[in-house]
């Protein structure tokens, strides 16, 4: 099955023909998820590798292997995964769109990658015939060809075996769950597993997301909330348009293209207009959770293939459920999406004044808009196609300005590990732009609305305090190190103490002077959107 393969298969919008879907194949197959955990040699990474080996060995023993066999099997899997990892792209390399796009005919795939029996792979996965495919990362796929040729059949079976067991630990008995949790403890420092009811809710929400979303919306998301959010989004759009007009580093030609893209944003708020149809999904009470989840997984795979392979992109589809406390920008549809659940404190409070709400949800809206113009989004046009709309000079200006952010975040250290400024660049551009755009929108509001001092803070100060409150949190050092290895967002603390020193209006609001701890000279601040 698909979960046992050493690479990933999917279907998504063709980056250069965004109206249509394209079958994709790319790197995958790593139990620890990312390359760094196999190739780095710092203390924490070594601990994680040791815990992962212990985890696999224990799972092999639990399904009937004696200790010596379990040890041998674990070593075989580790050898295969280490080979895949060494050939895989790093988190930074995965951000380079051109290097991760290699479109070819299906026949070319068969010729270029003869070490994999593609006909059987796609047949077994339930795909109809298709003409074109995109290979995301050629090198790891070539490495898989070599592994398949050079590895004994027994070891290949062992690899598939651990993928099946490992993929099922969350839906088997508690002893399997406990083994999986031991690995989580080392990876993220978490000391206590979530209670079963929370895990059950997550499982159902993951499977029947929009069915739960419909109930959530009926209960918690009145039409008035949708209207309020739409007004906020329009105000932020106006503010970004003003800031584009005022940018001194862009030519008129590029500004016109940027504004055209901004005006063509598709805006999704609250919940989808058309709910997912789950009527074909069978849940059988006489079966175990494991069997039901296997059937459900098969249903969703078949459903996605039927709706997407050889079909145009469905622009009404949502990438998140209404009950998800998050938001996103999708470059291939040029859409910004704000699920119903983000419209609650600390992001949005109907009883709070505009200063707080613009610093909270306003910053988030501005953040998502800025993704349309970040290191990746800026490469896509208003129709969602990857296509350059910048003059060469403006592109250079943009890159020199974003480099300031890369260098600034590279210097930030948390839990003994440095933030990766290149990996987090897109999100840091999002925060930088989001703060500037939301602040500008608040200034527009204050031209007609009197917002006085509250609790001893000016409206401008409350705006930044609201942003800081959104990201307030407490994380164990192991979890911070984990995030800095896998997450394209900077850790929460850096999203405040790293982001604010780049924003001119913050200095004025709090009268920050040279000599203050977070002070950065004006010529070292990133002025982008």
Residue ranges with predicted function:
Residues 1-231, 235:
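Noncatalytic, helix-rich "gating/capping" subdomain that lines the substrate-entry/channel surface
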Residues 112-115, 134-138, 194, 198-201, ...:
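Intrinsically disordered, low-complexity linker/terminal regions across diverse proteins
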